């Protein structure tokens, strides 16, 4: 219990950039934000178009206490907090859930949206929590992408 408590305490004051991608598990990002905030972390969210099919920016904003970023080409977002600044301002980047599609983007360096561009621009530790159907998980393409990312 003490070891778990010290791990949670390690998040106090840390800035976590949470990337929420498309998949039914996106709703779990809401609980993750709550737990990170409870541990004392600051949370800023990037929501992909697919992620927005499952959770709303308002829900993420209400729990994180910060604006939600989603559009790579928004003049407002770029002037306030571009993809470079989003990646620099974080101590840790977490992709949860990480859909099969987003894992492929990460593995192949595709930068066609804000979330993928942020990941290419970051030099911070990045954690991905894959979430998909078991057949998608077992597919050779997904396994190859995971091997590339490891």
Residue ranges of predicted features:
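A cross-family phosphate/adenosyl-ligand binding-site feature
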Residues: 1-128, 133-150
